[in-house]
Amino acid sequence: MRIKNGVWARKRHKKWLKLAKGYFGAKSKIFKQAHVAVMRSLRYAYIGRRLKKRDFRRLWITRINAAARQNGLSYSKFMNGLKKAGINLNRKVLADMAVNDQKAFAELVEIAKKQINAQ
């Protein structure tokens, strides 16, 4: 006796169509187009999760550089001074300080300047 895949095929199709909900036109209605669109969107999401890390690091460095230059020091010299002073703050925290707590950031810049001048 031949057993067809009707129930399971419908279940599989519904799963992909559910993931394609909100897509425009045939991409949310027709299984084949929905499957292709969802696979592409999942690929972009995967790539985006990796790009997000680079983008945020770049943003943090830009913010630190801008704040350090306002206090008379370049980014590379500032980071070098902090390293010599033994201050181990990551770029995320430094960028947050540069935006939200400029007084504390200015103190860090002064510490970095002293360490650079001491060498």
UniProtKB/Swiss-Prot annotation:
The keyword Hydrolase is annotated on this UniProt entry: no
CDD domains in the record: Ribosomal_L20
Xref: InterPro entries: Ribosomal_bL20, RIBOSOMAL_L20_CS, Ribosomal_protein_bL20_C
Residue pairs linked by disulfide bridges in the UniProt entry: none
One Pfam family from the record: Ribosomal_L20
Molecular function per GO: rRNA binding; structural constituent of ribosome
Keyword Transmembrane helix among UniProt keywords: no
Gene Ontology biological process terms in this record: ribosomal large subunit assembly; translation
Keyword annotations of the record: Ribonucleoprotein, Ribosomal protein, RNA-binding, rRNA-binding
GO CC annotation, single: ribosome
Family designation: Belongs to the bacterial ribosomal protein bL20 family.
Annotated function: Binds directly to 23S ribosomal RNA and is necessary for the in vitro assembly process of the 50S ribosomal subunit. It is not involved in the protein synthesizing functions of that subunit.
PANTHER family: 39S RIBOSOMAL PROTEIN L20 (PTHR10986)
Record protein name field: Large ribosomal subunit protein bL20
Source organism (scientific name): Caldicellulosiruptor bescii (strain ATCC BAA-1888 / DSM 6725 / KCTC 15123 / Z-1320) (Anaerocellum thermophilum)
